[in-house]
A protein has these predicted regions:
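Glycine- and acidic-residue-biased ligand/ion/polar-headgroup-sensing regions
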Residues: 39-55
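Structural motif
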Residues: 32, 44, 51, 77, ...
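Short acidic-glycine-tyrosine-enriched beta hairpin
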Residues: 58-77
Length: 110
């Protein structure tokens, strides 16, 4: 298992193979990830705790509660946020960890 600290919280990568990656993401309250898309990467997330805000390209928001899932296809613009309290999610994806195109970022990352 490998922990990766992020400005919005951290990731615990618990599985990493040539075919898939499994991560647990902890998003601190009041933080959000970049508005982004992936050219190749496909991912499914499962909410463990907290209310996850999922933003799309048009700014629409979907709120997900513990036990709910969300699938992200390649080229689908998305952003995850923890607006009300800290959020923990499980993410299972294809192994393309560096496949991130950031459109907006609260922390100045490109």
């Amino acid at each position: 298992m490998r922990k990766v600290n992020k400005r919005w919280g951290h990731e615990l990568i618990w599985a990493e193979t040539d075919n898939y990656v499994g991560k647990m993401l902890h998003i601190e309250s009041g933080h959000r990830l970049s508005l982004q898309y992936h050219e190749i990467k496909e991912e499914t997330i499962y909410v463990l705790s907290g209310i996850l805000y999922v933003y799309d390209a048009e700014g629409s928001i979907t709120k997900l509660s513990p036990g709910e899932c969300f699938h992200v296809n390649p080229l689908q613009v998305h952003r995850f946020g923890a607006n009300e309290s800290a959020v923990e999610i499980i993410e299972v994806s294809t192994p393309h960890l560096d496949d991130v195109v950031r459109l907006e970022d609260d922390y100045g990352r490109k």
